[in-house]
Structures are given as structure tokens and as C-alpha cells.
């Protein structure tokens, strides 16, 4: 039985209205440049305008050249900026010459800038003109518009990670708190986007568990969610409509996933280490991510309300391990995987969920001791 109440807080949070104000007041602009507009001075700044590159912006510039990333990294670490600038300028000039020789139209490069706290211009990304810009302020405003006026005023942003380019956070509002089996949860939405092409734009239902401050992103194939790449033409009216549908159904979807998640307590499993290692291999996790998952599961088993190995404990171990990551994007990746492990379908019932875990258990039993 899920009961609703409105007095649970999950860690640090801030009003949604504050975040909207911050995003709307940022100084950012875009330019369409040719190859000649990318020439560098000896400090690896843009000659035209004097902008400094962010690390990811400089990486996108270097991708236009044939220089191996290891070479670029070595020159940067050894403080060979003038030489590096010379190499890049020569490569860019070569590209411009090749276009002229082939009678191709001049390359149009979508160049993104923002100011830092001191007012200095930063070049943060370079794209082809196929890039579809939907920035964080636009996306968050669409989410806010999908709420009622009172929900918007009282909505709170949790676990915000924002560096001016990538934004990841969870959003809850009145009516999002849940009490299930004596444990406190919250349901809401997870928001993710990048203004420099490093992350998909996503708005998805989300579940948070108070006792361990873990999060889980609902990722069923049959559920409502927004997930788009910043490529081609994006119809902003259609995007806003899709977000309204997702936000409108988010609590119902999260409630359903919460029931499925808790049903996993009844799916008793034998060898948790083998199962976690098998799932790590299935989903191409790194060795370190799998080790953190094993540690997170051990911590989960020590909780007074858990104790036994089950589908619930294994999934919760994964969401616990996600909190160890220093990168919000990795945390989101692992929380999304946890959501997929809860159930592959929005309307899946207990027998289907148990059958899938039995298949995983069977595959895990065949792992060789060398792999373990």
C-alpha cells in the first residue's frame, strides 16, 4: 500500500523558481564561423574575439584535425601551447584549402560561447550546422510550464549538477512523497541535458529512497518519457507537448515502478556476487563500477529492513554504488540501469519480473571461476 504525504526532504534542494532565474540570466551566445574564424594565438585562444576554450570546447576543436588525442594531451601537459596552436592552425588551413580546391562551399561551424564568473568569454563547443540547440533554460522552463502554478512555486530541485554546459537534476513537488512498508520514498522526474552535445536531452520519471538517499530513473520501454539527441530539427511546440505528457504521467509511472521495485523483495536469489558480475558484463559496466556495485550491495544487506539477497537488494546496491561516483552523468547512467532492471515493461506483473531474474540467475550460475 502506497500512502502520500508532504514532509520528506531528500538532502540539499533549492526552489525551481531560483533555478529558472539563474538559467535565464546567464550570458551565452552562438556564432556561425568559417575555418578562418577558428585561428588560434600562441596561448591557444581564438584570435577573433580572444575567447578561451573550455576543456571540452578545445577537444571539439581538435576533433576537426587529424591530431591524435594523446598527442594533444601530451602537448598541453608539457606546456607547448605555441607549438600546439601552430599545428592546429596548419590543420585548419589545410581543411580550408581542400574545400577551395574541391569547389565546396565554405564550412559553416556552429560555435557556442558563454561567460565565466569574471566575464571572460569561453568557447565551449563546435558543431556542424545540423546541431539542434535546446538549452537548459528552455528545457527547464518547459518542465515548469507542465506543472500547475502552485506546483511550480513549491517545486524543489534536488541533486543539481550544473557547470554551465551540462545540467542534471531531480524535480519534486507537493504530492510526490510516499510511504511504503514503513519506508519513505519520493517520486518525481529526472532531468538531463547538455548544451555541448555530451548528453541526450531527457525527462523521465524518478524514484528516490530516503533511508539511503538513492535514486532510480524509470526506464520502461512502454512508459512515457522524453529522450532526444540535439541533432536535426527539433519542433519546440511538439517537445513542450511531449514534456507535458511525461510530467503529467510521471507520478503514476513512478508509483507503478515503485510497486515493481518493492515486489523484488519477494524474488529471493542465491549467489548475489555472481548475479552482479553477470549483470555488469551484460550491461558493459567497467570493473570499477562492478566492484562498487558489489560494495553497495553489501551495504544494502546490512540495512535492518533488508537482510536477505533479493532482486530488490541487488537493484538497491546498484543505486547505492551510483552515489560513489564523482560524475553526475555516471550516476544518472547507473540509476537508469537500475530502472531497467526493475522491469522492462510498465505493465509487467510479478511472474514476469521473477522469470526475468531467474534467467539472469541461470546465466550467472554458468560464469567460470576465472571470471569471478
Feature-to-residue mapping (PLM):
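Feature for intrinsically disordered/low-complexity regulatory segments and propeptides
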Residues: 1-141
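Intrinsic disorder/low-complexity polar-acidic segments
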Residues: 131-372
